[in-house]
Amino acid sequence: MKRKELHETSRLAYGRRMTTRPAHIAMFSIALHGHVNPSLEVIRELVARGHRVTYAIPRLLADKVAEAGAEPKLWNSTLPGPDADPEAWGSTLLDNVEPFLADAIQSLPQLAQAYEGDEPDLVLHDIASYTARVLGRRWEVPVISLSPCMVAWEGYEQEVGEPMWEEPRKTERGQAYYARFHAWLEENGITDHPDPFIGRPDRSLVLIPKALQPHADRVDETTYTFVGACQGDRTAEGDWARPEGAEKVVLVSLGSAFTKQPAFYRECVRAFGELPGWHTVLQVGRHVDPAELGDVPDNVEVRTWVPQLAILQQADLFVTHAGAGGSQEGLATATPMIAVPQAADQFGNADMLQGLGVARTLPTEEATAKALRTAALALVDDPEVAARLKEIQARMAQEAGTRGPADLIEAELAAARG
């Protein structure tokens, strides 16, 4: 039986038993908004269906998952938190990956103890939670990855992974990283190589629009199911009113992590503050003092944090770091984008957005006031850009929703229960 048919048959069978057999589902994530927010509506839907959902999360974001109806299982993380200085993440590949392994190793005994005698029927996990996969193997229950960003396609390792790791693997530090990872897995009875252990889940729900996935035609859809952005009611984040007389509104945001860019923000003030009829909302984060921006004209609104989706629903342009969340919100609201990627998957997202014909990409060092203004004026009045955005927006509306992911999770539960 094909996986699609299995899902449908199992879902219907499971639905008949749900009234007497609710499941315990355990979700695992790290304390970063971009890793927690994308799946919250899926959690909310599972709770609404009668499942008990526990959520392994550091205290910093425990209230957020509790609001979705999950029971927080608290643990102490060694990773930089959501308000940490971006420089805490380092600047090299090994700087970026070593903290995740160290955190996984120290969190495993905490989480094993937290779930002792309360083992779940199924494990859900963010891609950064290596511990969840180890525990899922130990408990012999289904494990499903919830990916908030692009996933590996057939050929990814040869085209991206191996070239990226070629030099770090040769170093003593790189070899020590892999030796430590291998040893930790082997201690837990796992013989997988670390790379596929992290990057090749047995089952994954991809929480981005298929339009943002590179080489989507080469993604194994027996493993990965694209369910689109699962956006729920965001009114709790606050509202925003477009100023009267504003002919164009531009939102500038580099997300929640890599926001320490005062020089870039000054270029944005120069780029858009001098445009007649334009109003700019500039989110600078917690690590930039607005005084560092110098003289700011009245048509530039400087904020530490903004209700992003509420503004995008009224904006004419989005200057973004091209994180997965921001990219799909730009597409969902049909807002042209200038992508200024800062780290990780943002460079790939920026390439995808530009390839779709709905964005221009500027490296941070090239994002001068002149370059930003030129890109902005070219994008906002281009009818072809607007038409492409409307087409993608319509496709996304068909993908989106929380019932689909919940149905698929229930299908995996039913298949495991036989």
Curated annotation (Swiss-Prot):
EC number: 2.4.1.-
GO molecular function, one term: UDP-glycosyltransferase activity
Keyword Transferase: yes
Keywords associated with the record: Antibiotic resistance, Glycosyltransferase, Transferase
InterPro entries linked: Glycosyltransferase_28, UDP_glucos_trans, UDP_glycos_trans_CS, UDPGT_MGT-like
Pfam families given in the database record: UDPGT
BP term (GO), one: antibiotic biosynthetic process
EC primary class: transferase
Function: Specifically inactivates macrolides via 2'-O-glycosylation using UDP-glucose.
NCBIfam families from the UniProt entry: macro_glyco_Mgt, MGT
Family, as annotated: Belongs to the UDP-glycosyltransferase family.
Stated name of the protein: Macrolide glycosyltransferase
Organism of this sequence: Streptomyces lividans
